[in-house]
Swiss-Prot record:
Its main location: secreted. This is Periviscerokinin-1. Belongs to the periviscerokinin family. Mediates visceral muscle contractile activity (myotropic activity). GO terms for cellular component: extracellular region. The lineage of its organism: Eukaryota, Metazoa, Ecdysozoa, Arthropoda, Hexapoda. Keywords: Amidation, Neuropeptide, Secreted. It is found in: Secreted. It comes from the Eukaryota. The modification Threonine amide is found at residue 11. The keyword NADP does not apply. GO terms for biological process: neuropeptide signaling pathway.
Amino acid sequence: GSSGLISFPRT
């Protein structure tokens, strides 16, 4: 759940 350029899923 990153709030950067790309949103990655939280693991």
